[in-house]
Amino acid sequence: MSNNNGLIIGIDLGTTNSCVSVMEGAQKVVIENPEGKRTTPSVVSYKNGEIIVGDAAKRQMLTNPNTIVSIKRLMGTSKKVKINDKGVEKELTPEEVSASILSYLKDYAEKKTGQKISRAVITVPAYFNDAERQATKTAGKIAGLTVERIINEPTAAALAYGIDKGHREMKVLVYDLGGGTFDVSLLDIADGTFEVMATAGDNRLGGDDWDNKIIEWIIAEIKKDHPSLDLKSDKMAMQRLKEAAERAKIELSAQLETLISLPFIAVTPEGPVNAELTLSRAKFEELTKDLLERTRNPIADVLKEAKVDPSQVDEILLVGGSTRMPAVQKLVESMIPNKAPNRTINPDEVVAIGAAVQGGVLRGDVKDILLLDVTPLTLAIETLGGVATPIIKRNTTIPVSKSQIFSTAQDNQESVDVSIYQGERPMARENKSLGTFSLGGIQPAPKGKPQIEITFNIDANGILNVKAKDLTTGKENSITISNSSELDENEIQRMIRDAEANKERDAIVKQRIEMRYEGEGIVNTINEILGSKEAEALPAQEKASLTKIVDGINGALKAEKWDELKEQIDGFKKWRDDMSKKYGGGEAPAEPK
C-alpha cells in the first residue's frame, strides 16, 4: 500500500544548478521553477536582510558582492562564507546557504503540486564522504525537510534510466561530470535490482574547472596588451569573466569557435579596456586536456574493481551538463569502444528524476525495486604504529555492519581511543579523520589480553556509526560520525526559525526584485525602440507616451515605489497591446525576460 504521509520529492542539489522532481502516479515529473525553467541556479544572494535564490540571485552576481555560488564545494568542511549586508558582517555555514536553496525548491514544488511537502530524497556525489553527507542532511533539516534518504547521483541516474527497462539484465556505466564534482559508477541492473558494482571519482573536479581554464586564458590574452592590468583583484571584472567563460564553454559544445566580447572590462589611466577574443574548440580542448585526463583513471578503476571488461558494458549514461562537451564524449567512447553513450536522457534532470523514483519506492508507490549502493571509500581505525586498519573496504554494498576484535597496546591499559579514518592510504594520518571517541573501564591486564570489539555500521544513507565494546566487562561506547563543522541542535533550530520567520518577507522581496528587473528591461526595450529607424514612423504622441513610461519607471525604481512601478509596467503592456491591434495584429515589442 502507498504511504500517504505526503509526497516525497527528489532533489538534485548541484554545485551549479539544482533540480526537483516528483512521482505523480507512474509519471516522473520535473517541476518547473517560477521562471518556467526546469533547473534552478544554485546561487544565493543577500540584500537588505533578505535572501534571494536562483535566477534572481544569479542576475545580481555582477552588482551584489553578497552573492554566493558553488557552496556545495564547502559542504562537510568547517569553512564559512562571509557577507556584509547593510554594514553588518555575518558568517554563514555551507549548510545554512544550501538550506536556502533547498527551501526555495521545496516552496515552488509545493505551489506547483498544491501539496504541503516535508519529505525528500536528496542526491550527493558518490564520492561524498561521511561529513559531506551529514552536512546535506543538516541542510535539509534547516529547510524544513525530513531527508528520507541520501543516494548517490550516478545511482539515481541509473535508477531513472533503468526503471522503464523491464526485466532486461544490463551493466550500466554512469559518467557524471557536474559543476563541481565527478563520479563514475558501474551498476548491474536485473529484475528490478540496481546493484552498484564499483564507484570512483574526484570531489574536486567539475565544470567550474573548465570555466577557470578559459578565464586564465582570457586574462593572459588581455595582459599581452596591458601587462600591468590586474583583473584578478577586480571582483566585478572576474564575475564578468566567469559568465563569459561559461557561455563560451556552452557555445563550443555546438560550434567550432566562439567570440568572447568584453567591452569596458577594466579602466586604466590610458582609458577603457575592451576585449574581443576568438576561442576555438581546438584551443579550448588543449587548455583543458589535463582536466579531461583526470576523468580517465576512474573509468578504468571501476571496470577493474568490478572485474568487467569494457565490451561487457551494455549502456553508458552521461550525466551533468559538462558531459555535453564533445571532448568528454570522445574520451568515454575511447574507453568503452563500440558503445556510443545513450543520448535519450537529459543530463541536467536525470539525477533528480532518479531521486523522485527512490521517493516513490519509499512511499510504496513504486514496486519491485531494490537499490544496492556501495560505500565509496575504505573505513578504518588507527592501530599501533599509526596504521590504518580497514574495517569496511571501499565498494562494499550498503547497508552493512562489520566487526573486528582488537586489544590494548600497553600493560594495564584502562581505556582505548578509537580514531576513525576514511580513505585508501596505509597510514592513518594520510586519510581523512572522521572522529575519535574513548572506551574506558577496561580491567587492568597484560597488553593484548583484553578483547575490544569494534563494529562499523553504515546505513542506507551511507552514514557511519561506530561502536566499541569490551567483551570482558560488557561496557561499550559509540559515535555517529557527523560533519566536522557540525551545528548543534540549538543552532539548527535557530536557522529553521529564521527561515520560517522570513518566508513572507523573502517572498515580497523576491517579487520586488523581479519587478525591478522587469522594469529595467522595459526601459531598455523602449530606449531601443526610440533609438531605432522604425521610431521615425511613430507619431509624436506615441513617442511621448513611451518617454513618459520610461520616466515613470525610472522614478518609481529610484523611489522604490512598488505600486507605482507596477502601474508603469502595466501601462507599457497596455501600450504594446494597443500598438499590436492598431498596426494590424503584428507582433508587439517583446517583453524583456
UniProtKB/Swiss-Prot annotation:
Q: What is this protein called?
A: Chaperone protein DnaK
Triggers of expression: By stress conditions e.g. heat shock.
Gene symbol here is dnaK
Record-listed Phosphothreonine modification sites: 181
Q: Which residues does UniProt assign to the signal peptide? A: none
Give the molecular function GO annotations: ATP binding; ATP-dependent protein folding chaperone; unfolded protein binding
Coiled-coil stretches, from where to where? Answer: none
Q: Which PROSITE patterns match?
A: HSP70_1, HSP70_2, HSP70_3
Function, as annotated: Acts as a chaperone.
| Homology family | Belongs to the heat shock protein 70 family.
Recorded hits in HAMAP family, A to Z, give: DnaK
Q: Which PANTHER family match?
A: HEAT SHOCK PROTEIN 70KDA
User: Per UniProt, which keywords does this protein have?
Assistant: ATP-binding, Chaperone, Nucleotide-binding, Phosphoprotein, Stress response
